[in-house]
Amino acid sequence: MIDFISRHIRFIFLVCLVFMINACQEDPARHLNLGNWYLQRGLLDEAIMEYREVSRLYSGDQSQLKRDEFQVLGKAHLKLAIAYTKKGWWEYALSEAKRSFDISPDKDCHELIVLIEEKLSQDTKG
């Protein structure tokens, strides 16, 4: 009887451990959505932290990412570029916009790159 109870206690402990590990895993899409929420409210530093966290979570072998994960990563870099422009950090913004374009080339990324490059060239002239 004691052996039976001991096995059940170990089983329950292992199940709890698995649930705790799964609960602690990070969800990049959740960080992207939270960053978007912060950005909409003008909380730029918080938004930047969330977008950078998405990048950190996907910092491993990107050849193993699924299509939707590439989209999340690309959007995080694009939104990070936008947040940097709002802070006036144009060089960082350009770097992130280019990174976003490399991951997920689209019209929005390209247009943002062009706008940032124009802003930087105006700043050097003026």
What are the residue ranges of the model-derived segments?
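Bacterial Sec signal peptide processing site at the extreme N-terminus
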Residues: 23-40
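Flexible helix-coil transition and linker loops at the boundaries of alpha-helical arrays
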Residues: 57-70, 106
